[in-house]
Curated annotation (Swiss-Prot):
Subunit (UniProt): Forms a complex composed of a calmodulin-dependent catalytic subunit (also known as calcineurin A) and a regulatory Ca(2+)-binding subunit (also known as calcineurin B). There are three catalytic subunits, each encoded by a separate gene (PPP3CA, PPP3CB, and PPP3CC) and two regulatory subunits which are also encoded by separate genes (PPP3R1 and PPP3R2). In response to an increase in Ca(2+) intracellular levels, forms a complex composed of PPP3CC/calcineurin A, calcineurin B and calmodulin.
GO molecular function, one term: calmodulin-dependent protein phosphatase activity
Phylogenetic lineage: Eukaryota, Metazoa, Chordata, Craniata, Vertebrata
Binding site for Fe cation: 86, 88, 114
Coiled coil spans: none
Domain notes: The autoinhibitory domain prevents access to the catalytic site. The autoinhibitory segment prevents access to the substrate binding site.
CDD domains: MPP_PP2B
Name of the molecule in the record: Serine/threonine-protein phosphatase 2B catalytic subunit gamma isoform
Region: Calcineurin B binding, residue numbers: 344-366
Chain ranges for the short sequence motif SAPNY motif as given in the UniProt record: 303-307
């Protein structure tokens, strides 16, 4: 060993190239000019992980809501335009999106929803997009996604993020503004743009125009379908004549078929449906062409690259101009690191420290025999009782060591799985569940446990399909605390299925 000494600073960062986030929150005077937020100032501050004074954040959210409230449930937008899919709190990739798609000051944009949850910079996405909406109300348009609701933001990450970075008041303001988001857009009188897709209860564009959107999306019905439905997994090659079948992946809404989409397009004189809602390896997908027009009947666009930091997918935006459609792809950008569920490093380290401390205690106690642990002056009759007490203490510490070991394994697994564990914990019993755990676990917990059981910390997720398979459980509508799926609403879902079957029968008769 040389006599060289190492000095470690407690104030400097280990990686000095990464600057500290700004400690000062931007004030009203710094952000607003002539009643509108200064977008460049806001962007430069948010990119550095800076925050705003709470009244400033609330002003942006509420002013954006006032504009959205005046828009129709189905807005009408013209080309040229850039259409964007899911963002999911990936703020630094959103900055890349605007580099690829063009500056919002001279480019018309349509976003298809899902701005929040899963990623760790959701509130930054909301504040920036809402600021753009305030500055460009006639050229930047925002639709609602299935994640813009109280139910999902409470289950996933957005509510927790708002509490940590701002307050629950900011979260509540976001929920109010989400209720104002339009549900669909008619692009150039040619394309229906929506987050999820079709509904058996929507046969015309007027059916969308008549919907009441100013509410929390229900667990069933046309609003739910616009936000949650998907094309059938064998879209364009269906083996059934049904137009709509139950969506087993989402646990709600429907799969819609190629014939259902073609019928809707023909009846409403449209070219195609443009939607988001599903991650795509290439960032987009063109589905089977309509026989009537020769144009893809359905297009999916997804704008969150390397989704959840594990999918390794490209993102894409769709540019439509002069009746020509171009897809522009882009890769992910580096972003600051957050521990799961916005945990601080001290809380995160407790299972690791606890495991070592209890392991040390067990080893110390195991060195000594029972006789050594009993004092010489103890009464002869109490020796047996005393030995049993000591054994019980050793067993208790051993159990505690096992608990900390499980917590440590869970922490490491969550760190490896990243966004695939959206609540920051593993499903109950993945590491230690026995018969009782299995008997009491919910269906969702059992499915999640089976999906990631046996996942090795040394294993690296290498493919898009593998990531999507592990994440499949998180694509479902989470269980509702008010048990809305039990009782009345389920009857409505059943009746909706009957309604869909009735429409399907009508469609078959019309085609025969």
């Amino acid at each position: 060993m040389s006599g060289r000494r190492f000095h470690l600073s407690t104030t400097d960062r280990v990686i000095k190239a990464v600057p500290f986030p700004p400690t000062q929150r931007l004030t009203f005077k710094e952000v607003f000019e002539n009643g509108k937020p200064k977008v460049d100032v806001l962007k430069n501050h948010l990119v550095k992980e800076g925050r705003l004074e709470e009244e400033v954040a609330l002003k942006i959210i509420n002013d954006g809501a006032a504009i959205l409230r005046q828009e129709k449930t189905m807005i009408e937008v013209d080309a040229p335009i850039t259409v964007c899919g899911d963002i999911h709190g990936q703020f630094f990739d959103l900055m890349k999106l605007f580099e690829v798609g063009g500056s919002p000051s001279n480019t018309r944009y349509l976003f298809l929803g899902d701005y929040v949850d899963r990623g760790y910079f959701s509130i930054e996405c909301v504040l920036y997009l809402w600021s753009l909406k305030i500055n460009h109300p006639k050229t930047l348009f925002l639709l609602r996604g299935n994640h813009e609701c109280r139910h999902l933001t409470d289950y996933f990450t957005f509510k927790q993020e708002c509490r940590i970075k701002y307050s629950e008041q900011v979260y509540d303001a976001c929920m109010e503004t989400f209720d104002c988001l339009p549900l669909a857009a008619l692009l150039n009188q040619q394309f229906l743009c929506v987050h999820g897709g079709m509904s058996p209860e929507i046969t015309s564009l007027d059916d969308i125009r008549k919907l009441d959107r100013f509410t929390e999306p229900p667990a069933f019905g046309p609003v739910c379908d616009l936000l949650w439905s998907d094309p059938s997994e064998d879209y364009g090659n269906e083996k059934t004549l049904e137009h709509y079948t139950h969506n087993t992946v989402r646990g709600c809404s429907y799969f819609y078929s190629y014939p259902a989409v073609c019928e809707f397009l023909q009846n409403n004189n449209l070219l195609s449906i443009i939607r988001a809602h599903e991650a795509q390896d290439a960032g987009y997908r063109m589905y089977r062409k309509s026989q009537a027009t020769g144009f893809p009947s359905l297009i999916t666009i997804f704008s969150a690259p390397n989704y959840l930091d594990v999918y390794n997918n490209k993102a894409a935006v769709l540019k439509y101009e002069n009746n020509v459609m171009n897809i522009r792809q882009f890769n992910c950008s580096p972003h600051p690191y957050w521990l799961p569920n916005f945990m601080d490093v001290f809380t995160w380290s407790l299972p690791f420290v606890g495991e070592k401390v209890t392991e040390m205690l067990v080893n110390v106690l195991n060195i000594c025999s029972d006789d050594e642990l009993i004092s010489d002056d103890e009464a002869e009759g109490s020796t047996t009782v005393r030995k049993e007490i000591i054994r019980n203490k050793i067993r208790a510490i051993g159990k505690m060591a096992r608990v900390f070991s499980i917590l440590r394994q869970e922490s490491e697994s969550v760190l490896t799985l990243k966004g695939l564990t959206p609540t920051g914990t593993l499903p109950l019993g993945v590491l230690s569940g026995g018969k009782q755990t299995i008997e009491t676990a919910t269906v969702e917990a059992v499915e999640a446990r089976e999906a990631i059981r046996g996942f090795s910390l040394q294993h690296k997720i290498r493919s898009f399909e593998e990531a999507r398979g592990l994440d499949r459980i998180n694509e479902r509508m989470p269980p509702r605390k008010d048990s809305i799926h039990a009782g009345g609403p389920m009857k409505s879902v059943t009746s909706a299925h009957s309604h869909a079957a009735h429409r399907s029968d009508q469609g078959k008769k019309a085609h025969s």
